[in-house]
Amino acid sequence: MITEGFPPNLNALKGSSLLEKRVDSLRQLNTTTVNQLLGLPGMTSTFTAPQLLQLRIIAITASAVSLIAGCLGMFFLSKMDKRRKVFRHDLIAFLIICDFLKAFILMIYPMIILINNSVYATPAFFNTLGWFTAFAIEGADMAIMIFAIHFAILIFKPNWKWRNKRSGNMEGGLYKKRSYIWPITALVPAILASLAFINYNKLNDDSDTTIILDNNNYNFPDSPRQGGYKPWSAWCYLPPKPYWYKIVLSWGPRYFIIIFIFAVYLSIYIFITSESKRIKAQIGDFNHNVLEEEKEKKKLFGLGHWGKAKWYFRSYFKLPLLHLLRNLKNFFTISFIDPNEETDDSGSSNGTFNFGESSNEIPTLFRKTNTGSDENVSASGGVRLLDYNSAKPLDMSKYAMSEQPDLERNNPFDCENDITLNPSELVSKQKEHKVTFSVENEGLDTRKSSMLGHQTFSCQNSLESPLAMYDNKNDNSDITSNIKEKGGIINNNSNNDDDDNNNNNDNDNDNNNSNNNNNNNNNNNNNNNNNNNNNNNNNNNNNNSNNIKNNVDNNNTNPADNIPTLSNEAFTPSQQFSQERVNNNADRCENSSFTNVQQHFQAQTYKQMKKRRAQIQKNLRAIFIYPLSYIGIWLFPIIADALQYNHEIKHGPTMWVTYIDTCVRPLSCLVDVIVYLFKEKPWNYSWAKTESKYLIEKYILKGELGEKEILKFCHSNWGKRGWYYRGKWKKRKCWKYSTNPLKRILWFVERFFKQLFELKLHFSFYDNCDDFEYWENYYSAKDSNDNKRTESDETKTNSSDRSLPSNSLELQAMLNNITAEEVEVPLFWRIIHHIPMLGGIDLDELNRLLKIRYNNDHFSLPGLKFALNQNKSHDKHQDVSTNSMVKSSFFSSNIVTNDDENSIEEDKNLRYSDASASENYLVKPTIPGTTPDPIIEAQNDNDSSDSSGIDLIAFLRNGPL
């Protein structure tokens, strides 16, 4: 309206015309009769009949696959041994159950519509299913939110630990509040799903839309309600308008969860990387890249303008860009390795722990053993905890790191305790090492020298004298002590006390192994022996030392007299051999040793931090893959939701996005189970695997289970159900060579599916089953390669003909004894044990593993040889019976004749027959059922241990008798 007396406002008229056009365009939205009756705007969720059929089939298929995967995942979770479970597994089960419920609800609606299409127009039907759908989806979102909160607390509140009464483990995170998880997960989604019925009785007014398609074949009532749920193509959910329904009740919380997951992960990433850099800065930079960069800068600047441009381009563009790309890669791959950090610990020129030394000069604590395995091995890997090898320096890293959990062991009991990085502990330990190895003005005292004696740190000796020729053969203290006896020229503070020198006038002191009691005993008993400077030296070094000593004895002089030009003229200034220079060089050697000690302990601390960081990275990859997979699952539904605001209302749905959206919505359960199986590997936590581990730890010192224990297990209640069985008995019943064709077929079918489950690319049906001699040698830990048949030798004959000669009465008697000892497992339990995670324990295989592991492990104790041989000189003619090998079940019945013999044989089975000691004092008792080394056997015949030694070995194997 134009007011009289005032000129018309052209801008206002133009704005009003544009607004009217916009309103007209909204009123001209195309729609269908079904959308108008349901209250759906425009062309939202408008499909043809074939498209609807395809979408519903996709939804049913994806939901069914997800349900099957959920059942499989719950089976593996339920069959994990309770000793191996931690709170994380409870959260995984909680997440799988929520996603399982969501997949089940999403499958109900399309199935009912395909069965009875008329219920599509029933408001009670789609409102009820819509409430359950919203409840299940929001419950799954709440579960992943709780998952993220739990791991955020583990990182930022590592001291929140509580004892798990069920397993005895220390649990963190939300473990103390675990009783609130299920109520919150049920209550919050129920409230959100119920709020959708606000304004349910309020009707939508879409009378101005243009109907272009009449598809009301379902007799919908003419009452488009604003609140409630709407039937979509393959599911029932919240209405797209008003927007607050889906934003407040569904997508808003979901976007918040996604942002929260990214924020938690980003904060953890920044926290760990910053702490790693701070620790590295506190304990020192081991790469020494600053000096190299300065040299490179001077070199490039010397090339003129082109060199300067190259340096600026590399410093301010290339390197920052590469650093950014590496950080992005590390962020998305959950890696905490510094892009500028060298990952090679081998001690190369660019290695992290290189201090200008060659690889041969790396300290022992950074080296691996001769077998190639790390010295820090868990007890389950053998008797490493009792390893005391005098030929090898002690590994100080074991003691310096004793307060920290074993980061290399994949132990489920520790997996949640190792995702925190405590820099204060690492730095404090490094400071403790500095204090412990502080050098006073007088030099290192005896105790410090003793501690340093365990490490093979190199010291660059700058003495240019004939003394240096003995440095590689004898300790410097050997020569200086003898010189001191001659003229008192050299005074070395690192020598032993005068009392020790007076008691051992002709002995050379071994400073590198001052803790070795055996060397002290040898010095007391043999006054004219020259101890080797390093027990790891070869025989040539020993021969050289003996030759030197022989020369000393022949000349009847002190070893110092054999040194060329060792006279007063030798120490004149012209010869650069003054007493002060020798003392100064010795002090510099000690200071150099101390510097190396400090650097090596710094490197050790940093290496420990790197191990912990690697464990954190591994565990974070295991736990954050669930939230990240959640984000990946909701990627296409988010795209589909974004298209609904404008594009779908005007033009209808984008079909390829809708297909993917319909497929991935129910697949959360499938993804959770795949991640769980891939990362957790629950088949390694079955009862059989866990019980086998505990049995190995129990019998590892004994070296075998023993026939008595095997039969005891087999005849127990669990053994009668097949949880404990003997491989010998099972192999003898092999169906591969049975005369019954049906049994042969079933054997091949069972072998096929077994290899299929193990994901073997090459199927092999060859087996030595039913070969009596082969399996007897195999389970006795003997070399059975000579007895192994080839496939060309196999013939389909009777099992008794293949295994036993028909004319052998002895073997036939053994077969009868085996049959009498066998335990018949019911058919039901035999079928059960073919199911994954429900297998039994092969006691024969476990016994064989114990024997092999015991033979390959170093087993020695401090002073064990001395305890075994302390009375050897008094009992040289005492013979010990060597017939104490435990017989297998094939021969046990032929040995026992009466009660007295039974008790004697049982006593023999509890003791070892002999104990052989090698040069480095490693005692290796003969394992029953194995063939001893003929060389060791000959040595034992000439030098057998006394009865007290055998009692000690028996005690170590079986405990107090």
Swiss-Prot record:
GO biological process: one example: adenylate cyclase-activating G protein-coupled receptor signaling pathway
Keywords: Cell membrane, G-protein coupled receptor, Membrane, Phosphoprotein, Receptor, Transducer, Transmembrane, Transmembrane helix
Positions carrying Phosphoserine: 373, 903
Chief place where the protein resides: membrane
Bilayer disposition of the protein: Multi-pass membrane protein
Extracellular-side segments: 1-56, 115-133, 199-250, 643-822
Matches recorded under Gene3D superfamilies: Rhodopsin 7-helix transmembrane proteins
GO cellular component: plasma membrane
Gene Ontology terms, MF aspect: D-glucose binding; G protein-coupled receptor activity
Biased composition (Basic and acidic residues): 783-796
Keyword Lyase set for record: no
Entry-linked InterPro entries: Glucose_rcpt_Git3_N (IPR023041), GPR1_C (IPR022596)
Residue intervals annotated with topology Cytoplasmic: 80-91, 157-178, 274-619, 844-961
Pfam families to which the protein is assigned, alphabetical: Git3, GPR_Gpa2_C
Residue numbers spanned by region Disordered: 468-568, 783-805
Transmembrane segments: 57-79, 92-114, 134-156, 179-198, 251-273, 620-642, 823-843
Subcellular location: Cell membrane
Biased composition (Low complexity): 502-558
Similarity annotation: Belongs to the G-protein coupled receptor GPR1/git3 family.
Record function comment: Seems to associate with GPA2 and act as G protein-coupled receptor that senses glucose and controls filamentous growth. It acts upstream of adenylate cyclase and is required for glucose activation of cAMP synthesis in concert with a glucose phosphorylation-dependent mechanism.
Protein name as annotated: G protein-coupled receptor GPR1
